């Protein structure tokens, strides 16, 4: 027998898929609960439907085979992408069929976006307000019109094509999801090959994706937007493909195209400076970032990511190995350092998801701030309603993602954490000194809470006593945010030093002039004062409490002094059995539950701060002499320094539009405001409640049914403690978010 040398063995192509692993069976899918042996037997009690929902997507409970779990998650991703593309297609279809997009394009300063017309059933057509240009419909605040203009879409036919393209894409995604689970399913080794994955994600998805987008921006968006900015009628603008096929059209707008690719290969890149610009600031016509700056940015990002994708060792013996990087990463005080983290992240999808959600959530909140400080789309900056809505949207989405990160970190700790792998590494060391971490964090929360709230209480008291000279304010005892002001000045001065070719600062929010578009403020310096200093410390307080709850849930998910064997009880359990009082509501799930309330609490204050600050100090009109009149007349600095000011001059004053909306086009928001308060109050019935009360009530109702011989075959059961809390928090958040939605919309659509 001949023994091949190892290097010849390695060169064989590896088979990394299984063929036809799982049959496609509609009969199986039609059976409710087919994924769980107990559930598949059908319902005995009403708890069955709850467990069906709780476990349908909990792949860990379907099988313990990591390969099968990985395949299910992979297939589910394609399903998710299909749902997203169908949803987007629907939005774009509405834009094509029911909207005033073309009228808005011709006059974006005076026509407001609308993509929904209500049918005249029992008088509901009152909701179709006059949005300008003779169109009546519901004003939308999703920013889609601004995005489409940025893409270079000039008519509804292009929107129809895009909508159909979205559906085709959804079909491809659905097919891919089915194909990669039922026909050619990747093996576990493929899912765990992190270097190839980084290679693909960085280089192909992010790198080539950005490069393709830069191409679209250069060849389609930039020329079309340049013509629209110059006031060329939409019907006279060439169609997107004409710019690509007819080079002379591009050369007329950007002479740099005349030289072709020669400057690229001769490294004479300056010739492309007319369409790859570095202007900084905002386009004075649209109030958005310069399209050519955005193209330049995406080209640079593409280069960075394509290079980054080449860093990792795959089939050739060069490049980084993630395992080696992690295992060599040891500090003087961190024991085994990052050893073991590679195994955690390649065998636990929860660990992977937890880190990704935490990063993505933080990034989403950063995006919320970029959308107003550096509005990327044309005419977004002057559409105040849209600005407020997309800020609020991104803030809340980010909050949910961060709480989800903590949830999956706790699930990782309970289900996937292996103490043998994590010996004296950074994770083990953090868990071992968790008492110090949590007690310090607790102290910080108490300190921040008392001091930040105390400043407000002091001001309320002094104002009530008629002693304004003793208040913390810009006109009495000043507490200026000096570090924030320093950062603002630094950024205003930076373009001359760090980016010598930039013509304007990165964002007028930091400093510079007032940019007005059509007599409305697009952006101007946001001056910070004592009121911002006070509310900033409330933000610090609420964020730290949220972190305290979530981090405690993760660090004590496996064990605590109270329940040393917590890991055996699972991610969610109501109490540690009978006879152990005081062990309720300590599971990982319960910490996520509590964290959600504080996340909502934190972010409500963030969006209130933003809404009032922008209306008071940024948004408004500019007259011919250059004088700015803000929506609420700059009242933030003196009113936002007391609790009473927040209640009276923000909540109550700005609720007048939603409260008085009946009989107007905004009346739906009045009903929503009422209905959402009701949903919120309904949540309290589940949150301030005991399971026994409901079970007792159900028993007597069942007795009455038995008396009348109409007893159901499926036994009614009261919600478990955990189910009741889940229903409670869901309605609390839904009610709170929809109330805020109605409050913000009715006000800003009236005054913005």
Swiss-Prot record:
Membrane topology: Multi-pass membrane protein
Domain of life: Bacteria
Binding locations of chlorophyll a': 677
Gene Ontology biological process terms, A to Z: photosynthesis
Binding site for phylloquinone: 694
Record PROSITE patterns: PHOTOSYSTEM_I_PSAAB
Subcellular location: Cellular thylakoid membrane
EC number: 1.97.1.12
Cofactor note: PSI electron transfer chain: 5 chlorophyll a, 1 chlorophyll a', 2 phylloquinones and 3 4Fe-4S clusters. PSI core antenna: 90 chlorophyll a, 22 carotenoids, 3 phospholipids and 1 galactolipid. P700 is a chlorophyll a/chlorophyll a' dimer, A0 is one or more chlorophyll a, A1 is one or both phylloquinones and FX is a shared 4Fe-4S iron-sulfur center.
Annotated binding of chlorophyll a, by residue: 685, 693
GO molecular function: 4 iron, 4 sulfur cluster binding; chlorophyll binding; electron transfer activity; magnesium ion binding; oxidoreductase activity
Name of the protein this chain belongs to: Photosystem I P700 chlorophyll a apoprotein A1
Gene giving rise to this polypeptide: psaA
